[in-house]
Amino acid sequence: MTDLAPLRRALLSVSDKTGLVALGKALAARGVELLSTGGTARALRDAGLEVKDVAEVTGFPEMMDGRVKTLHPAVHGGLLALRDNDDHLAAMQEHGIAGIDLVVVNLYPFEQTVAKGAQYDEVIENIDIGGPAMIRSAAKNHGFVSVVVDVEDYDVLIAQLEAYDGHTTYALRQRLAQTAYARTAAYDTAVSTWMAAQVGEPPRRRSFGGTLAQTLRYGENPHQDAAFYLDGSNSPGVATARQLQGKELSYNNINDTDAAFELVSEFDQGDGPACAIIKHANPCGVARAETLTEAYRRAFDCDRTSAFGGIIALNQPLDGATAEEISSIFTEVVIAPGADAEAQEVFAKKKNLRLLTTDGLADPTAPGLAIRQVSGGYLVQDRDTGRLSADALQIVTKRAPSDQEMADLMFAWTVAKHVKSNAIIYVKDGATVGVGAGQMSRVDSTRIAARKAQDMAEAMGLPAPLTQGSVVASDAFFPFADGLITAAEAGATALIQPGGSMRDDEVIAAADEAGLAMVFTGMRHFRH
């Protein structure tokens, strides 16, 4: 190993040609011999650069539709040979192997091929073999060899060659090697994850990979370090959103914004405007209305106190009128499919407010994984993509819900899916009026939601509690009748819950006695 290693010979083989020609010219200007393959070689030659085909080095042509190009001792010997080991140098001389001091590789676009929904055979052909092999060989020998797998490192390499007269430092080579191993690990993770989906059963080993998007100021609390990584998904959401203005997103901003956007994406744009306001990953107000402004107002009226400093998600592009309403209180983040010029002009006066646009909504039915770390391991499950139609509900009481009650029950059930358990949601006319979240007993969630609704009615000067004439959703069954009775006392007229308790008969009897309509979903929406 040496600190300064000369760079005399480089092998370039990339799928993403971004910055390739500029890098090639910078290397050639320093007298570096360029080796390459296929399309990369053509791109360099088209730019007027002298390039030697790898086939000239190996003595073998590319074969098997390009599957075999660089898998040869003339390549890997040139990468792996220790430059300060006499035996290695003798072997190189004996077999006519010349050293390769730099490998520039970015891999076949496997992740992008999967993301676009390609057929099985196309996905298989986009599993890179030679690229990862060269990356790993070069990275292992980083004492002498540089390996670049990220376009963003091209300028770093060029700057170092200029600063050290055609040499690289050990510190840079070591960092590049770490980046390289992280890339091959993430690549293999993507392939393994896709293969596991084809097999259809949990794999014996599972890895998770991502690309650093942002080093955060801190995590949930100031004493915790944190960073934000991307998994390569192109689905609309906080990870792919465009930030139009405002301060850098924090750890908690990202977490809450994701929760808000996932919730509001449950409501199709074609079914009308919807708004969700989130605090600490729980909704403090959700509503639908004829206009986006009215949807925001109704969501805000559910819990005006908690909405302060919250995250707002919209299912339609933000307009100027809604932006004016939102600007009246302190808001951390607004995320929407878009924002018109008037809305952006309004928010420009609020320099710290973060505005994100997504160019669409997330697909709540898209398959995926939910991952949680526990001491010594991970819990992995499918995303909760469960959805129900009114036709799938079981009416279990003497009275059936009215059409309006049924519409509100379906709305409440959708919201309950996104509330921390134990979750109780009061809804009236397409808007939440009370949310009980995260309590250890279901009856406490029922009481808290009703109490908050009553407090809000008093603050707004209304003559009756907001829960009067509402419906209630429970994310899991009522283990006793007390929660249902509490909801009835608060003025609820109908309930939706999974059912399945050993005391279902008691709960149904209590509903009938109170004149409530109740439906069972047969589906639970625990959220922890």
Swiss-Prot record:
Pathways involved: Purine metabolism; IMP biosynthesis via de novo pathway; 5-formamido-1-(5-phospho-D-ribosyl)imidazole-4-carboxamide from 5-amino-1-(5-phospho-D-ribosyl)imidazole-4-carboxamide (10-formyl THF route): step 1/1; Purine metabolism; IMP biosynthesis via de novo pathway; IMP from 5-formamido-1-(5-phospho-D-ribosyl)imidazole-4-carboxamide: step 1/1
Swiss-Prot/TrEMBL GO biological process terms: 'de novo' IMP biosynthetic process
Keyword vocabulary terms for this entry: Hydrolase, Multifunctional enzyme, Purine biosynthesis, Transferase
Cited InterPro entries: AICAR_Tfase_dup_dom_sf, Cytidine_deaminase-like, MGS-like_dom, MGS-like_dom_sf, PurH-like
EC number(s) per entry: 2.1.2.3, 3.5.4.10
Record text about domains: The IMP cyclohydrolase activity resides in the N-terminal region.
The protein's name in its UniProt record: Bifunctional purine biosynthesis protein PurH
Gene that encodes the chain: purH
